[in-house]
Each structure stands twice: as structure tokens, then as C-alpha cells.
Amino acid sequence: LRRCARVPARPELKWPNRRAHAAPLPARTFMDSEKLAELVADACDDRKATDIRLIRVDEVSSLADWMVIAGGQSDVQVRAIARSVEDRLETEADVLPLRKEGLNEGRWALLDYGDVIVHVLMPDERGYYDLEAFWSHGESRTFLPSV
């Protein structure tokens, strides 16, 4: 059996999958998690979400810093709210969700942005799962849109 020759190291490549002659990436400005949560709530409000709640969970959980919980009256509205959040955060904060769930069914959409987790639920699901009560030990506030 012949052994494959080892590929010599290329010192001009400092990072995997990045060529030495590639232009440096622009510096990203990171938005803090509270501002990101407020941007999410504002995007939910753009699509007429009901009872938008922001819950600070960073002191009680390592899962995220903020939970944003919003209501939609139909599966179409739940999907529209979730799309509004995705579009707004991509354009204004330059972030994409790490994971998305429930967009096809439209009864409970979940968008995970790492520091901020977004739940958009229909009234039956919101009442049944009662996420506000589950996270009641975190600081909670209702989103009030600016006029």
C-alpha cells in the first residue's frame, strides 16, 4: 500500500478557509442583548403582535440573556411576525438566528439568537405553556411602542 504524501503546511494561511490575499473582514459592531431584545420587540410590534413581553433571564439562566414573548392571532400572523424579526435583525443588527423552529406550523415560532430567544405563540399555545409564569423569577416588562 502506498501512503499518501502529507500536504505541506501553508504559512500564508492564518485562518482556515481564508486566503492570505483576501481582504480583511469589516469590523462588526455588536449590539448588546438588551438593545437586541428591544429591536426584536419593535419588529414584533410592526406586525401587530399582541402582549409583547421582555423577560431578563441572564441572572437565573445560562440559556440566554433575554426572552421575548409575543402573541399572534393566526398562523399567518405568527409567521409574519417571525419573518419581520428575522428581516429586521439581519438588516439592522447584522445577525441571523442560530436556530428556527415552528415556522411551518405557525402555532409557536421560536427564533434563537443566542443572547435573545424569541417566542411567537398563538393564544391557545401561549395560555397552555405559560412561558411568562415559567420565567417569572426573571425581571419582566411589557413592551410599550414609541409613538
What annotation goes with each model-predicted range?
Residues 10-59, 73-80, 87, 101-103, ...:
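Long, contiguous binding/interaction regions
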Residues 91-100:
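Active-site phosphate-binding and catalytic loops of NTP-dependent enzymes
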Residues 62:
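P-loop NTPase catalytic core of nucleic-acid-dependent motor ATPases
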